[in-house]
């Protein structure tokens, strides 16, 4: 399994993330070509090699030319969904922007849908966020781990005047995640950086055991008494067994007084907050009323964010949670070519006690549905073609 460890000893921002990925071997041409699939005009990447305290690093800046419109969350999600980006990149990019908009909305006391991203800042954030996720995808990263995050201190100038560091939106994004104070009078973790790492990281902690393959540094723009760099380490975890045991939290609540039209939004927002799965179960309540048991599974570091989403988007007054163990397959995404077009598929591998390998294949439903509609073919035929092509892969 290919993993990426973000060592955020001096914080994280979108451009630092892009720089670290390029320093670790991400092709600038592949990155730029992929980002062109957004259909976004008036930008270019400036990449240069710099040194900070004698350490070589990659500096990335998004140059925006011409005027740009104000964009709300729906506009940005439309750009992402209508792009030619791979399905996993679309999904993760949308999740990051939803979390960023949710935090900005909390700061200003408005709904996430009302948050607008200012002209140049919107383009910069789009390229930073989508580019970072695309970069991880192109490098084949399957798991992201991050160090705890330094808060920084002082004040930062922004469109709304001087604000304390960390910026209010950053603090909302960092709820439920490990942070620590520093004496640096600078903004170390930006809202974009916070949205990226809290959405993408599977866990936070010390440097993991792995076979180290690449190390790269992404440069920050602020001059500090120490290297203002994001260190990215790439590596592989080799295990004698392919299955993995891990713990997750199970969060539950029973609801019998909510408009049923609100349940789909509750599910969507809970998943966007970091749940790995969520579902509804019909139950009979104590007074004989029909009700719904809402269950969500999430990593331990996502508890605060997922709980906040459930309280915000449901009528519940309390949650139960417990720690469960689960076995997970080694997973990866792949793209297979079918007579109808290219289809992304999810591959899972599990080794049973006798050593026999069990492989599960799941074509991405939404992609199959769109391809079937475009080709005028039955969905089941596109799905079957994707399964057949995936079985021919030597994916593991």
From Swiss-Prot:
Gene3D superfamilies, A to Z: mk0293 like domain, Transcriptional regulatory protein pf0864 domain like
GO molecular function, one term: nickel cation binding
Coiled-coil residue windows: none
Keywords carried by this UniProt record: Lyase, Nickel
Matches recorded under PANTHER family: NICKEL INSERTION PROTEIN-RELATED, PYRIDINIUM-3,5-BISTHIOCARBOXYLIC ACID MONONUCLEOTIDE NICKEL INSERTION PROTEIN
Family according to the record: Belongs to the LarC family.
Protein name: Pyridinium-3,5-bisthiocarboxylic acid mononucleotide nickel insertion protein
Organism: Moorella thermoacetica (strain ATCC 39073 / JCM 9320)
